[in-house]
Amino acid sequence: AINPSVNANVGDIQRLPFLGLAAASVLADDAVNIARTDWDNFETSWDFRDLPLLREGTKGATLAESWRNWEAQSLAAIRRMQELETENNRLFIDAYGLAGELSSEVPEEQITLARPSARADVAAFLSYAVGCMMGRYSLEMPGLILANAGDTVAQYLQKVGSSLEQLRFAPDDDGIIPVLDGDWFAD
């Protein structure tokens, strides 16, 4: 027994068999970077910067083309993560002599990166578009621009460092976006 009590001390942990594998560390770093990038593609991430459909390398002439480019990038990231996890498993199986006991293969369905979904990605596009209309996001600079209910277009312009005329897309000044053909507000 490593320690007959319920407690685990530093010495107990140091006695656990572990082979330091530099290659596994590199694989882990790559996997973490892919997972972090995947998470940061969502507005719920604190590090969300912009919509993947609108990025250089993904953005196409149409939304459909942008989505196909995004789908290809997403599927490539999933395949790369699967390769990394399989290689990582192989390293540890070989290091601990478990070749006959375990398989290194990782099925694609076990990769937890977001799968491309036209429905979900168009919903994210619409959410981002509304965010741009309200000044939460900007096409001029990545990241969160305005986050508080009382923020103004003047604060938006100050944060993006442009005048209203220089913007590719300006936020609505009163935060009211008409979606019906009838008049409901004076503006």
Identify the meaning behind each predicted range.
Residues F18-D187:
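Non-catalytic DNA-recognition/assembly elements of restriction-modification systems
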Residues A1-R15, V26-I34:
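Basic, amphipathic alpha-helical recognition segments used for DNA target recognition
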